[in-house]
């Protein structure tokens, strides 16, 4: 079972294509998208969890292999990957988990809370733009100690799209069409997300906590 972790603020085609490609590559029956509750690593305001959850549900609804989990949102407190995987293991004890995230995030995996346990809970898939190289010396050293299939890097051309760019375009009233599903574009517009001062009520403030996570 694939596990697609992220803030999804907002979700876009890069996320969806990455999940689809990983599912095909590893012959996965299902990919569960898990919007983070309170992502401790984000040094900016993030949209309220319910907005991010609903956008993810809307974006994935048409693919029968995709589903969305609330485990991180409903747990409360900062979101740590080890808790995400432990909860999903409890819910799906017979499934082998493939945790998918950005390759750039994996470069700092040794700073995540309980990182030593992570590779016992799941296989990791780092998705990246074509040409990306995992250069962090700590993760490069770690790779030599892991089983061959513990961590795989996969190039995804659609990852040239980023949530940061989508937010900036919305703030500048620039078009979001063809960067994300039409239904998500309409949701962003209807709820007035990412439009500067007008969306203060749609935001929740998170600060960098003294812990580790994704």
Curated annotation (Swiss-Prot):
Pfam family for this entry, one: CTP_transf_like
Catalytic activity: nicotinate beta-D-ribonucleotide + ATP + H(+) = deamido-NAD(+) + diphosphate
Pathway: Cofactor biosynthesis; NAD(+) biosynthesis; deamido-NAD(+) from nicotinate D-ribonucleotide: step 1/1
Entry EC number(s): 2.7.7.18
This protein's UniProt keywords: ATP-binding, NAD, Nucleotide-binding, Nucleotidyltransferase, Pyridine nucleotide biosynthesis, Transferase
Gene Ontology biological-process annotations: NAD biosynthetic process
GO molecular function, one term: ATP binding
Keyword S-adenosyl-L-methionine among UniProt keywords: no
Alphabetical list of InterPro entries matching this protein: Cyt_trans-like (IPR004821), NadD/NMNAT (IPR005248), Rossmann-like_a/b/a_fold (IPR014729)
Presence of keyword Mitochondrion: no
Stated family: Belongs to the NadD family.
Purpose: Catalyzes the reversible adenylation of nicotinate mononucleotide (NaMN) to nicotinic acid adenine dinucleotide (NaAD).
Name of the molecule in the record: Probable nicotinate-nucleotide adenylyltransferase
Species this chain originates from: Mycobacterium bovis (strain ATCC BAA-935 / AF2122/97)
């Amino acid at each position: 079972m694939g596990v697609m972790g992220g803030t999804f603020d907002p979700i876009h085609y890069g996320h969806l294509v990455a999940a689809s490609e990983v599912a095909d590559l590893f012959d996965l029956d299902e990919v569960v998208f898990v919007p983070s509750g309170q992502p401790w690593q984000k040094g900016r305001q993030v949209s309220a969890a319910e907005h991010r959850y609903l956008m993810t549900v809307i974006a994935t609804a048409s693919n029968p292999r995709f589903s969305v989990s609330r485990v991180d949102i409903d747990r409360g407190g900062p979101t740590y990957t080890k808790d995400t995987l432990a909860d999903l293991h409890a819910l799906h004890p017979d499934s082998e988990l493939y945790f998918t995230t950005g390759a750039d995030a994996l470069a700092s995996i040794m700073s995540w809370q309980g990182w030593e346990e992570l590779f016992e809970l799941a296989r990791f898939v780092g998705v990246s733009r074509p040409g990306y190289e995992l250069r962090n010396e700590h993760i490069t050293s770690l790779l030599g100690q892991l089983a061959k299939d513990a961590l795989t890097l996969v190039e995804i051309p659609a990852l040239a799209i980023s949530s940061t760019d989508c937010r900036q375009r919305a703030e500048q009233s620039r078009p979001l069409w063809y960067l994300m599903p039409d239904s998500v574009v309409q949701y962003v517009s209807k709820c007035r997300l990412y439009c500067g001062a007008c969306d203060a009520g749609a935001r929740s403030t998170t600060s960098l906590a003294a812990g580790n996570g994704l």
